[in-house]
Each structure stands twice: as C-alpha cells, then as structure tokens.
C-alpha cells in the first residue's frame, strides 16, 4: 500500500492535532467535578464512563497521522494503567502539556535531543522528590480515602475496599463480580490467586479487557505435560454433555493439544481455558494439591495411579468463578471451608518441622494463598450502563489502594506536582544549562496542568489557583469539590505516590519521543468508491454480507 511521508514541523503539528483531540476528550473527566463521556458502541447500549484509559482506547481518527498522535498519548495512559492501575487521566493531561510546550521550543529552533535530555533529568529528580514526600499508609482510614478519591469521590466504595483489605489483608485478593441487586455488597469466600495467565490469548472471553471469565467451571488439575489431545478426549466429551466451562491447569500443554482446545473454544463447541501450573518441581505439585483441596477435586498424577485418559467428572474440581488474564489466575471457590482449614493446619505443621528458611518461606507463601481467601465485591446498579461505569471506578479504586500500600501516599488533587514545580525550577537553574535547562523548564511548566484542569472542571480559574497553591505549604492544596484551600491529608484528598510517579514518567517518556520526531510514514487514506453496489433483486442494498 502506498505511504504518505511527512517531515519536520508539518509532521509534529499533525501529531499535535491528534494529541489535542484525545487529551481534551479525556481531560473533561478529571477531578471531583469532572464530567462523563458517552461511548457509542457498534453493538449494545452506549457506555457512559469517567475512566481515562477506557475513553483513550475508544478514540480512532480518520486521518492516519492524527491517529498516530492519539496512539502515542494513549500509550502514556495504558502504561500508567498497567503499572499503577489509576492516574491515566493525569498522565494524559501531563503528556499533552509537555508536548505543547516542547513543540513551541522546537519550532523556535531548540535542539529536540538536548531538550529530551533535560526532560529526562528533570523527571528523574522529581521521581526522587515524590518518594521523599510520600507517607506510608498506616490505617484502614487512609486506605478508604485513597479508594474514595480513585472512585470519583464515592465514600461507600472507599469504605468497602478498606473493609475488604481488613478481611483478606493488604496483599489479599479482591475480585469484582456483577451483583444481582441494586446495592453493592462485600463477601469473603475461599479462593486463591497465582501468577500464571492463560497459555493462549484465544481463551479470552472478554476481548476488550483481554481476560477469560468462566462461571461455575469444572477444573482439571494435572502435573503432567499434555502433548496429545487424545489424552483429553474422554474428559472433554463428558464435559461437553454438561454444557459447563472447563479450566485446565497443567504443567504445560503442547502445540497439537493446545491448537485443538483453541479451535473448540473459537467454534463454541466447548468453553475452555488452559493455564500453566505455578511453581517448579515438588512445589508445583504441592500447589496443585492445594488447588485440588480448594476446589474439591483430585490432582490427576501418575504417582497416585491416576491417568488423564481415565479421568471422570467426579475427579474434577469445581469453582464459583475463575478469572484469567495474561498474568494471573484467580479462583473463587465456596463450600470447602473444613477441607481448606485442614490443609492449612497441615502446612503449619510442615513449617514447624522444617529447619530450612527457604522451605519455611515457600510454605508461608502457600499458606497465605490458601488461607487468605478472596474478597468478592458484588457490584450493584439500576441499569447495565451504570453497572459498567461503577465497575470501572471500583477497579481504579482497588488498584489505587494497592499502589498506596506499595509506595505510600502524597497530597492529591494535583497538589504534589504543583508544589514540586518551584522546587524543580530552583534545582534546574543550579544544575542544568542551555537547552537542557529549557527541557527541565518544559516539565516545570507542565506540572501545574493537572491542578489547573481539575480547577477548570470545577468552574474556577486554573492559572490563579495553581499560583496560589504554589505559595502554600506542601500539604495544602485546592479542594475542587468545595472550592476551598485545605490541608489535603486532613481532608482525605490523597493520591498513591506510585500513581503520581508512573503518570509523570510515562508522560515525560511520550513527550520526549514526540519532540524528537522528524518524519512520519503513514498509510495514504483509501479512496472511497462514489457508487456503492446495489443489493441483489429483492434484497436491501445496505446489508453487510
């Protein structure tokens, strides 16, 4: 296909147009008074949401070059989402501000490579400052505050996540389900999560989120490599008759068997997903046995004289729901409390008997996975549209609280970055010179962008508020919900340090790449035929065949 090649200023301006469109669509959701965005869907009802990264993923422009700009900024949002699970809108607003300021300097003749060096040095300095100013999370009240802010100022959500963390521990698993009622409920049940995802992405049932969710599945546990599909056929035939999904957790599944499972899954013959078992050697076998106890099934192993080809339905485990993404698998089981408790006691005995600190650590890991359970939040809402929005907010809130537990919290509402702006200026003036200093100044000027946008969305003058906040102590900021200047920590307006750090790093990275772009190669737009072919006689001409 023929390509269009654009150079220099023209290339950067085309990227900038795409970046402007995406940034504006996402920025309207920022802050306590941010608005919602409606996404029109090809199938099903429109979605009304407030989640930056989901909006960014939906935007696609007709112009290929502008679309490249959209894709670049979308990457800043996605990477922040992957690292911290929240702060995607802040990352987008920051990246947009840095690109705008940077392009002005490049157009005026500044060297883009040296500017990028300055941006990178400034970012490194700021990351250190964010870590210096972060406070560790001490109580469930701080967890609730983090959850509340991430969920768009929903106190009920923040409190529910704090309760869930109290019950399953700070490292515990919190899972989301669509509830059957109007209210959102919390329930703690048996379950575990391990760090292995699906073997093939074709097992994903939700292609937008790239995860497989299987309700009431059978679970086949084996410690052998499955090389031939013939080994699986007897058990697959039995399961196909029941109409229930199947999850296979095995040492590995080789190409031929995997291809057969994928084909059956895609044709809708059998809803199946396959996962590699976690761990190695004896530890892998022990973890599979833990899962067998949890799911009320048997581990099919030749050590116990059990073969795959002779497996029956009563040897398989069952669960309430299994969620698998590319990195983790979460099993939610129920009704096996006694068996799980007995297994935990057995692991504790082994811990008492062993002298090896390594074995003790690994046994402790297994015990935590098995005994911790899973907190299930059942999301309730009046309509499906509200349910989807609530689920996204809850997901952000869960990720934000986990990030806060990891790296601590800093004052929220864009306050931390705004206060770091004069500190960065002072450092840059002393330590950098020439165009590197200009690069650092680009970052410094962009740091107030999130606060300004939060204020503007609340109907205030962003520039005035940003200048006022800079003159106040580090903890003081602007509460956009009430329109007052307050001590952010006391008011419960806090952000996880990890979210602020990731957003800044990803924004600076994308801005640096855009500024150093000198040429774009993109597809030429396709010429559309002026006359559309009519349908066959007696048929509508506007069907897609």
Swiss-Prot record:
It catalyses: ATP + H2O + a folded polypeptide = ADP + phosphate + an unfolded polypeptide. It is found in: Cytoplasm. It holds the Pfam family Cpn60_TCP1. It is an enzyme of class 5 (isomerase). InterPro entries: Chaperonin_Cpn60_CS (IPR018370), Cpn60/GroEL (IPR001844), Cpn60/GroEL/TCP-1 (IPR002423), GroEL-like_apical_dom_sf (IPR027409), GROEL-like_equatorial_sf (IPR027413), TCP-1-like_intermed_sf (IPR027410). GO terms for biological process: protein refolding. The keyword ATP-binding applies. GO terms for cellular component: cytoplasm. Its EC number is 5.6.1.7. Forms a cylinder of 14 subunits composed of two heptameric rings stacked back-to-back. Interacts with the co-chaperonin GroES. NCBIfam families: GroEL (TIGR02348), PRK00013.1 (NF000592), PRK12849.1 (NF009487), PRK12850.1 (NF009488), PRK12851.1 (NF009489). Together with its co-chaperonin GroES, plays an essential role in assisting protein folding. The GroEL-GroES system forms a nano-cage that allows encapsulation of the non-native substrate proteins and provides a physical environment optimized to promote and accelerate protein folding. Belongs to the chaperonin (HSP60) family. PANTHER family: 60 KDA HEAT SHOCK PROTEIN, MITOCHONDRIAL. This is Chaperonin GroEL 2. It comes from Prochlorococcus marinus (strain MIT 9301). The lineage of its organism: Bacteria, Bacillati, Cyanobacteriota, Cyanophyceae, Synechococcales.
């Amino acid at each position: 296909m023929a390509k269009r090649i654009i150079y220099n200023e023209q290339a950067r301006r085309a990227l900038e147009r795409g970046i402007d469109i995406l940034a504006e669509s996402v920025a309207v959701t920022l802050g306590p008074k941010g608005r919602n965005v409606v996404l029109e869907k090809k199938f099903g009802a429109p979605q009304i949401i407030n989640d930056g990264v989901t909006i960014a993923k939906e935007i696609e422009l007709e112009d290929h070059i502008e679309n490249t700009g959209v894709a670049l900024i979308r990457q800043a949002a996605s990477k922040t989402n992957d690292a911290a699970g929240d702060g995607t809108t802040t990352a987008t607003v920051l990246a947009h501000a840095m690109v705008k300021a940077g392009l002005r300097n490049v157009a005026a003749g500044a060297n883009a490579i040296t500017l990028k060096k300055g941006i990178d040095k400034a970012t490194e300095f700021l990351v250190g400052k964010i870590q210096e100013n972060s406070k560790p999370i001490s109580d469930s009240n701080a967890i609730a505050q983090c959850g509340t802010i991430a969920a768009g100022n929903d106190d009920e959500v923040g409190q529910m996540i704090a309760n869930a963390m109290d019950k399953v521990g700070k490292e515990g698993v919190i899972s989301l389900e669509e509830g059957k009622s109007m209210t959102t409920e919390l329930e703690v049940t048996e379950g575990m999560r391990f760090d292995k995802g699906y073997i093939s992405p074709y097992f994903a049932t939700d292609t937008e989120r790239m995860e497989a969710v299987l309700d009431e599945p059978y679970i086949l546990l084996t410690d052998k490599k499955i090389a031939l599909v013939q080994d699986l056929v007897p058990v697959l035939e039995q399961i196909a008759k029941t109409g229930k999904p199947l999850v296979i957790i095995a040492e590995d599944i080789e190409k031929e068997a995997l291809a057969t499972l994928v084909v059956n899954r895609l044709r809708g013959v059998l809803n199946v997903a396959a996962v590699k078992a976690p761990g190695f050697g004896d530890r892998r076998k022990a973890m599979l046995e833990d899962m067998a106890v949890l799911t009320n099934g048997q581990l099919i192993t030749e050590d116990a004289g059990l073969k795959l080809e002779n497996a029956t339905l009563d040897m398989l485990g069952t669960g309430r729901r299994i969620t698998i993404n590319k990195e983790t698998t979460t099993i939610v089981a129920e009704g096996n409390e006694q068996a799980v408790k007995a297994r935990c006691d057995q692991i504790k005995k082994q811990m008492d008997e062993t002298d090896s600190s390594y074995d003790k650590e690994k046994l402790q890991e297994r015990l935590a996975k098995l005994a911790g359970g899973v907190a299930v939040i059942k999301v309730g809402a009046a309509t499906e549209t509200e349910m989807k929005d609530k689920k996204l907010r809850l997901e952000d809130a869960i990720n934000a609280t986990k990030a806060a537990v990891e790296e601590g919290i800093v004052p929220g509402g864009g306050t931390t970055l705004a206060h770091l702006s004069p500190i960065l200026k002072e450092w840059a003036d002393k330590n950098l010179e020439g165009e590197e200093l200009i690069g650092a100044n680009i970052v410094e000027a962009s740091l107030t962008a999130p606060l300004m946008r939060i204020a503007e969305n609340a109907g205030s003058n962003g520039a005035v508020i940003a200048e006022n906040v800079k003159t106040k102590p580090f903890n003081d900021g602007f509460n956009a919900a009430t329109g007052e200047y307050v001590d952010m920590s006391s008011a419960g307006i806090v952000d996880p340090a990890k979210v602020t750090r990731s957003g800044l790093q990803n924004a600076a990275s994308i801005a640096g790449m855009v500024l150093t772009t000198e040429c774009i190669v993109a597809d030429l737009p396709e010429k559309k035929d002026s006359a559309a072919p009519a349908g066959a006689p007696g048929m509508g001409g506007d069907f897609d065949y």
